Regions:
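Structured binding/interaction patches within domain cores
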Residues: 1-131
Length: 131
């Protein structure tokens, strides 16, 4: 689970600027470390989940794509520090939420939905595995 968290944190750090929530940042900082305790995981997981819930309420009835992007970044951070259960894939879950964040950002900026997030995620994974 430690390697899953480390890769997930690297992937989500690419989209973190869409959130800028200190609780999300704390979750990513903890997930990026190999030496995290269960107590640390519990604290940052709860904080990241609170950020996720709050970001969802900020999205509003009229879709604000930038707020939606921030919500997906928070969901990605929650995946980074979530409980590792049999069959779970923390890095995959975080990567999918990061892709959703990037898609929302491109819609918000009028760039459409084309982006290279998946390619960048594979590059990050390859770099991690080669170290």
């Amino acid at each position: 689970a430690s390697q899953q968290r480390q890769v997930a944190a690297r992937i989500v750090q690419r989209v973190f600027p869409m959130s800028n929530d200190v609780r999300v940042k704390a979750a990513l900082d903890v997930a990026a470390r190999a030496d995290i305790s269960d107590a640390e995981l519990t604290v940052v997981s709860q904080a990241a989940n609170t950020a996720r819930v709050e970001s969802f309420t900020q999205c509003g009835k009229e879709t604000d794509w930038s707020a939606q992007a921030g919500h997906f970044v928070a969901k990605a951070a929650v995946a980074c520090v979530g409980a590792a259960t049999p069959g779970s894939n923390l890095a995959w879950d975080a990567a999918m939420q990061a892709r959703m964040a990037r898609t929302c950002e491109t819609v918000a900026t009028g760039e459409g939905t084309e982006n290279r997030e998946a390619e960048e995620q594979y590059r990050i994974l390859e770099a991690f595995l080669n170290n």
